[in-house]
């Protein structure tokens, strides 16, 4: 991780891809930028994303191979240049792309003399090979060569205890990690109180997905990891609070919604997410539990609808409307939630 001083200024938080290239079928590279971040935030985001990219993204691998009656993995088969162990190592390197779940079967069945590559693997419809030229074995003589394979989708790195097989079936240490490497750099910008940080993130993948796809999946995994905290029910609500919550004045947002639609600045209501309103976490969580994600969702509700949301109170309604008045550059009607 590198820190450098650079000059620059960014007004709103945004991310973008500043470089993308394909070095080979099994090596993709992407460079991304996120800014502006307050001091310390770049490190927090960089560490979390790096861990998620390397350990939380699923990949598809060959996890087992069955050769027939072969006593151990160091055995050789007549007419084949490689030992069983070398073939297993070659199978381990095969890069697959799929969205399958569970275990799937695949196979190789060819006749020599010839080179066997990844292209010779007979796969289920949901799986494809990233690089069909990857070598597996070299048949020097006119012999039949058949292998039964197992394919699985998982994450991280799995090893299995090896022992002499009775039926010629051997596990393959699978690396379910489509992201090969991740680096991040932090750059400081601005002066005095205006100082902020810019995060640069570099991602290398094995070709089964692009760096942009990997970044998206890692971000989703991090969000899912914190969702249980957002769904935690508030404890200790008093009887008076519950009573007040059940007896609100039943006004609607309809006039306000109409006013917003007539807004000259043309605010896309379905593109404004409630997390952009900077609501308190308790109010925000109430709305999210009710599947209210955008300003369009919110303004389509009546006050009666909102008051039916678990833990939603009159104070929340007034706070929401005050927030809209504060952040939206439009003239809003004066009627609000009354306390």
Curated annotation (Swiss-Prot):
Gene: rpoA
EC number: 2.7.7.6
One GO MF term attached to the UniProt entry: DNA binding
Chain segments carrying region Alpha C-terminal domain (alpha-CTD): 264-339
Gene Ontology cellular component terms for the protein in this record: chloroplast; DNA-directed RNA polymerase complex; mitochondrion
Role of this protein: DNA-dependent RNA polymerase catalyzes the transcription of DNA into RNA using the four ribonucleoside triphosphates as substrates.
First-level EC class: transferase
Keywords, in A-Z order: Chloroplast, DNA-directed RNA polymerase, Nucleotidyltransferase, Plastid, Transcription, Transferase
GO biological process terms, semicolon-separated: DNA-templated transcription
Protein name: DNA-directed RNA polymerase subunit alpha
Pfam families: RNA_pol_A_bac (PF01000), RNA_pol_A_CTD (PF03118), RNA_pol_L (PF01193)
